[in-house]
Amino acid sequence: MKKILVVAALMLSSVSTFAQHAVGSFNLQPKVGVSIANLTEVKGSDHRVGLVAGVEGEYQASDILSVSAGVLYSMQGAKANFANLVDATNRLDYINVPIMANVYVVKGLAVKLGVQPGFNVSNKIKVNNLDAVENPAKAQSVDVSIPVGLSYEYNNFQLDARYNWGVSKAFKLTDAKNSVFQITLGYKFDL
C-alpha cells in the first residue's frame, strides 16, 4: 500500500509539474536578478553589474502564446578606465516597462520578444573612490530597447534570461546606447 501511495504521489506531482497555464488565465510574477550592462560607442568601457527587480503580469492567450507586461527597476551603465589613472562608473538606473510576446515552444520553455520603454531615475558618476555625484553628461529621460530572451518555468518558478538591445541614445550629446543582459528568477502566482 505504501508503494502505491508513493507511485501515485509521484505521478500527480509530474502532472502538475508539466501543466501549462490555462488559456485565458492571468498570473503575476515578482522577480529578482542580476543585470550586466554596458554602453555601446564608449571606447574601453566595461560592464557594470547590478540589480534588476520588479513584477510582471502575464495573460495566456493560447496554448503556445502569452503576452506580458511588467515594471522592473534596473541598474545599468558602464565602467571605464582612463589612461590607467581614473576609474569611473556611470550609474544609469531605470524603471523599465517590458511588453513581451512569449511563445512556448515546449512545455515550460518560452522564446520572448518585445519592446521596452525605460524611464531614467538616476544618472550618477563615481570617480575613483569619491562619492557618486550627478553626471554632467545629461541622460535621456526615456530609453527604448528591444528585449529578446528565453525563459524556463518549473513548478511556477521561472528562470528568465534576456538581452535588452538599446535602440535609442542613452545621453543627449553622444551616440552611446544601453546594452544589457539580465538573468532573473521569479515565481508565478495565478490570479
Where are these regions (language model features)?
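Residues on the lipid-exposed face of transmembrane beta-strands in outer-membrane beta-barrel proteins
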Residues: 30-34, 51-59, 71-73, 97-103, ...
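Helix-adjacent hinge/juxtasegments
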Residues: 79-113
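Transmembrane beta-barrel outer-membrane domains
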Residues: 23-25, 42-50, 88-94, 137-143, ...
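Outer-membrane beta-barrel channels and translocator barrels
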Residues: 21-23, 60-62, 106, 154-157, ...
